[in-house]
From Swiss-Prot:
GO terms for molecular function: UDP-N-acetylglucosamine 1-carboxyvinyltransferase activity. It is an enzyme of class 2 (transferase). Belongs to the EPSP synthase family. MurA subfamily. The keyword Cytoplasm applies. The active site is at 117 (proton donor). Its main location: cytoplasm. This is UDP-N-acetylglucosamine 1-carboxyvinyltransferase. It is found in: Cytoplasm. Pfam families: EPSP_synthase. The keyword Cytoplasm applies. Coiled coil: none annotated. GO terms for biological process: cell division; cell wall organization; peptidoglycan biosynthetic process; regulation of cell shape; UDP-N-acetylgalactosamine biosynthetic process.
Length: 421
């Protein structure tokens, strides 16, 4: 097995222009939603990511024809199995998004759970509860979940126990082919939900309310094909804005959506950043000033995104003063903290909160990437740290950032990928 590392020599200021890629959290559910139609679909602005590669392999394994170049062409008319391979599913929990479209169109779907553990079961509870209310029969075993229905799924009024982006996608996608009207209350409001809904509308579903906490879906008997372009990735945008903020420099994020990052922009302005924006770009300039520490509390959209928490941890540890990060969405999402402490950060963990005391500089060392967003914060930390930083297990970052080392090099970083066998 090969393991990639990043070797980063710092400190180097990061500045310039960066082109923002398509949103991973839109691209994945939209690719799985192509299973709802037997008509061909062309999808533009799909990011080049490991999770996208796995999704395309999974669709191909189910029998779909997929051509993946600059544009992704998907034809699922030849799908001949409703069971997703464990070897593919185990590496990506987002594969649960195949279940709703499979049972909605073919009457059956079987998805192996990642790792086949109790944690996996808890992760799919909201998904399967929603499908059950749409009329699916669910068999939930230790290693897999099967959904089946005689005839079509039927519309339902579903009140979600808690806000969940993933479960909202599953229910909305399955309801696209259900008989009658489905109402989702307490739905997730993320821009990626709106993007997925717009794709389903393009296929022929009637959807209202996406982006609010109540979504209404009028199911169609059959869906068509068409062309669709994925929205820009707001988390990638936020990551590069933080890159310039911690470097005390400037950046322009081209092909972005400022309207999806209001809370992030608000907090960056609180830190002292000068921010300008247009319809499809955001510019940040620190004018050489050290940032001021801020307090953020993660919330479902439109609140501060949990996927920006690790990046703002980095911002706080190199800022003036004391800042707090409060995590309310996920447990155990502070795994980047011990790695940053090894680089000289002053951080204290208090239950679901971390308190950061700003330091003048960080010191390069060898660190371990533990998850997607944590790995991004460690890479940025390496860019501004004194000396050599080695980031292990960068496959995490390949899951969610399109050619991050190339984009950082264009901004001035001294970063190299090394493959160890």
């Amino acid at each position: 097995m090969t393991v990639d590392r990043f070797y980063i020599h710092g400190p180097t200021p990061l500045s310039g222009e960066v082109n923002i890629s398509g949103a991973k959290n839109s691209a994945l559910p939209i690719l799985f939603a192509t299973l709802l139609t037997e008509e061909p679909v062309e999808i533009f602005n799909v990011p080049k990511l490991k999770d996208i590669d796995v999704t395309i392999k999974l669709l191909t394994q189910l029998g779909a024809k997929v051509d993946h170049c600059d544009v992704v062409f998907v034809d699922t008319s030849s799908v001949n199995t409703c069971c997703a391979s464990y070897d593919l599913v185990k590496s990506m929990r987002a594969s649960i998004w195949a279940l709703g479209p499979l049972v909605a169109r073919f009457g059956e779907g079987k998805i192996w759970l990642p790792g086949g553990c109790s944690i996996g079961k808890r992760l799919v509870d909201l998904h399967v509860n929603g499908l059950e209310q749409l009329g699916a029969t669910i068999i939930l075993e230790e290693e897999y979940v099967t959904a089946s229905v005689n005839g079509r799924l039927h519309g339902a009024h579903i009140i979600m126990d808690k806000i969940s982006v993933g479960a909202t996608v599953t229910i909305m996608s399955a309801a696209a082919l259900a008989e009658g009207v489905t109402i989702i209350d307490n739905a997730a409001r993320e821009p990626e939900i709106v993007d997925t809904a717009n794709f389903l509308i393009m296929l022929g579903t009637n959807i209202n309310g996406a982006g609010s906490n109540r979504i209404t879906i009028e199911g169609a008997q059959k869906l068509g094909g068409g062309k669709y372009s994925i929205m820009p990735d707001r988390i990638e945008t936020g990551t590069f804005l933080v890159a310039a903020a911690v470097s005390r420099t400037n950046v322009v994020c081209l092909g972005s959506r400022p309207d999806t990052l209001r809370f992030v922009i608000k907090k960056l302005r609180e830190s002292g950043a000068d921010i300008n924006m247009g319809k499809d770009w955001i510019g940040l300039n620190m004018h050489g000033k050290r940032p001021k520490a801020v307090t953020v509390c993660t919330k479902p959209y439109p609140g501060f995104p949990t996927d920006m928490q690790a990046q703002f941890t980095l911002l706080n540890i190199v800022s003036k003063g004391k800042g707090k990060i409060i995590e309310t969405i996920f447990e155990n999402r502070f795994m980047h903290v011990p790695e940053l402490v090894r680089m000289g950060a002053r951080i204290k963990i208090l239950n679901n909160m971390i308190v950061c005391h700003g330091v003048d500089s960080l010191i390069g060392t060898q660190v371990m990437a533990t998850d997607l967003r944590a790995s991004a914060s460690l890479v940025l930390a390496g860019c501004i740290a004194e000396g050599l930083t080695i980031v292990d297990c960068v496959y995490h970052i390949d899951r969610g950032y399109d050619h991050i080392e190339k984009k950082l090099r264009n901004m001035g970083a001294h970063i190299k990928r090394v493959t160890n066998k």
